[in-house]
Amino acid sequence: MLCVMMLLFSAIASFPVSAQAKDQDAGILIIYSTLDGKESSQVKMLDLLAGHFTSHVTVKKDSDVEASDFKGKDHVIYYGQTKRKLSQKLLSLISGVKKPVVAIGYNAGQISQFSGLSLARKENVFQVHSRSEKADVSLESGLNVLSVSGLKGTALYTFKADEGTTHSFIWKTKKGNVYIGLTNLLNDNLIVAKQLREAFGEKAGTTLLYLRLEDISPMSDEKLLLQAGTYLHKRHIPFILAVIPVYLNPETGDKVYLSNQPKMVKVLKKLQSMGGSIIVHGYTHAYRYSETGEGFEFWDAKADQPITSGNAEDPPSILEKEQDFPNEQAYHSYLEPFREKEETYTKQKLTRAIEDLTSSGLYPLAFEAPHYTMSEYGYQIASQYFTSIFGQVQLSSTTWKTSGAPPFVTAPSMLHGMTLYPETIGFVDTSKQNPLGEMEEHISQMIDFEGGVAGGFYHPYLGMKYLPELVDQMERIPDSEWLDLKKTKQTVKTDKVEIHTSGDGTIQVKNGVSPIYEFFDHHRQTPLEKALWILSAVVLLFVIMFVSYTFYLRATLKKRIFKERRSLG
């Protein structure tokens, strides 16, 4: 997946735009053609890529594009995932674009900038030839490509068909327009992406490194956590602490709050002062009664659908499919009450996570969705609380099983203003014969690519067995630097808390959460328990009144006796 994303990036990089810095004033318009008119996972991947170059990305389906969509847009990308006859209106609008256009997949031959383009065949290839490097590049998993012919300009990449003939699949016209012969943007080939970028003259910048200490909950071993954080500190490495404020017992539903674990809080505060940056990794990292660290929290994994109820006692409502409704409007009307429940649930979780951590002296600077799963509406809600998010992104509105990330820091339209720090090298997987094997492969790929983000995570419960080697592997990436989140500009806020960093390494905090509010928030009761507490309060009140009345009678009696004695004396 990373490879195709970088391949696309390389093509887009033919424009005079820095690969490492966004032009905030420039905009990118993505026009897509899909079978059902919806933003597919591939379209969202393209959005993630484009968001690296600008935070002003507009994504429109072909039939909805208007002339106003082109205003303020320096670049236009057309993506044809399916074959379709494009409207004359759309073709006229694209033909009027003065700067180079990128076209991907089908239908590009209808666009004037690619007049004469012919797509002869679709093949799965395992070796391609880079014209710029004059070298063959092997593809481990293969790549589905469209054979290109009929264009004037330069073939950037070619492949050999089974019969031995050579065909091109990526082309640059004489006027600088770029065609990429791919339809599936989720394929995986990093080597091709690196070669393609070089073919377009992209100069690599500094590779950004980051390492998250993952799944830190109130039940984590604080000694192992301190050991890992101290090691990174001694190596002068800033690190990320992905914290879950509440542990949920899957058998009883009981909660263990971080604030009730003083040893863990002390360790986290110490690590925060030693270069660690806290991020919210969910509130419980669980949905219903799944175990903390295993549950999804912001996606119903069992039903594979968005959250429909925040109450663990309620049976899940299985959402109907859009095809079961007469039109799109009827479907959206049906979804509205469920979206309201999802909004309430998500806001409560994020608010409590931020406020619980802040009240313990731990100041979260970003967000990481548990298991990287969340609906796009969930991302929109999260953007009201955070300016940055870590990890990968769920690319489907119907299943959690499709996720991905670009090789760069990005601010796509689907994240509604949040900046994504992508996870690209994975984690230490002890279920494998070589737990570090896949990470080492991904690190090698990032070395070849140059100038991206090499981000991964490590579970502190593994102890120190793999951490030194992992850090050594990451630091072998040349021209790289570690991300210090405190030295970036971040904002995290709720109605009662505001956390800001201005980029100088300091954190400014405004905390309006009272200890009393926090106590009652942590001791929410069932209706029966509330009734018992009310009854207890009433009984206590009567006891207090009885005791007070008893003291009153005794005091009155003493006064009477005193007066009687004085009168007799």
UniProtKB/Swiss-Prot annotation:
The keyword Membrane applies. Keywords: Cell membrane, Membrane, Signal, Transmembrane, Transmembrane helix. Residues 1-21 form the signal peptide. It is a single-pass type I membrane protein. The lineage of its organism: Bacteria, Bacillati, Bacillota, Bacilli, Bacillales. InterPro entries: DUF2334. Residues 22-530 are extracellular. This is Uncharacterized protein YdaL. It holds the Pfam family DUF2334. The chain crosses the membrane at residues 531-551. The keyword Metal-binding does not apply.
